[in-house]
Amino acid sequence: MNTHGFFRRLWPPRSEKKTPPCWPVPSAKQPITDTPLVVFDLETTGLNQRKDQVISIGAVKILPAGLPMRSSFYELLNIPLDKYPRDGQLIHGLTQHDLQQGKDPATALESFLHYAQNHLWFAFHAEFDRHMLSRAVQQYLGVHYDPAPIDIALLAPLLNPGHNGLIYLDDWLNHFGLDNSTRHNALGDALATAELLLILKQQALRAGYHSWAEVLLAAQRHQKLGQQQNTALLMF
């Protein structure tokens, strides 16, 4: 009796784990002046981080020399229709027909990650986009990936003392007199956010910061101090 074949049928060999693709992200400890950046924005079917889906991705690169206007990324994702309203209502100006013209989600996501690799990631109110992107990559590519984007909404109050009341992206765009007329899709939002980040980058350099890690640490401390001060005021 071929016992080897018998036991192989009972316990088939485990399939080898697929090595996940590598989309490297540079260290935030590198000098600000030498670090290429990517600003991204997602549009989703809603704000439920467990159930809603990513429907479009927009991104813009910022190189050490500045903002190359032609280096942008935008894709619609052809997600299953049961994840999208069937009554023809618009979400972010998109219809079911628009969505059906989009790319296969796995293809779109892989293209985006390839586009963004070797760049330090940024987003405005980044935590939501971070979670939604990581979940989509897990769902469609079967790998865990977290580029840990830096939250621009956290950096702006640090570099602009006395303007803690500015919360939303439009608030900051209006504050700096930046044009927000392009904000009609994920790419428009990413472009507007990139223009804001360029201003913050110059402010960080003038303030004496050498790396984005230093700016982020100072911003986290600034936020914590503000929260403590607000708590103290509520106690009186």
Features from the language model and the residues they span:
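Acidic two-metal-ion nuclease catalytic site recognized across multiple nuclease folds
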Residues: 2-27, 198-236
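Conserved non-catalytic scaffold segment of RNase H-like nuclease domains
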Residues: 9-134, 138, 146, 174-184, ...
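Short hydrophobic/aromatic-enriched beta-strand-loop microsegments
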Residues: 143-150
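Short, amphipathic alpha-helical segments that act as regulatory/interfacial helices
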Residues: 134, 194-201
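Short alpha-helix plus adjacent loop in nuclease-associated cores
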Residues: 150-164
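A polyampholytic, Gly/Pro-enriched intrinsically disordered region
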Residues: 163-179
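Active-site catalytic microenvironments for nucleophilic, acid-base chemistry
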Residues: 139, 158, 175, 199-203
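Acidic, divalent-metal-coordinating active-site segment for phosphoryl/phosphodiester hydrolysis
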Residues: 185-196
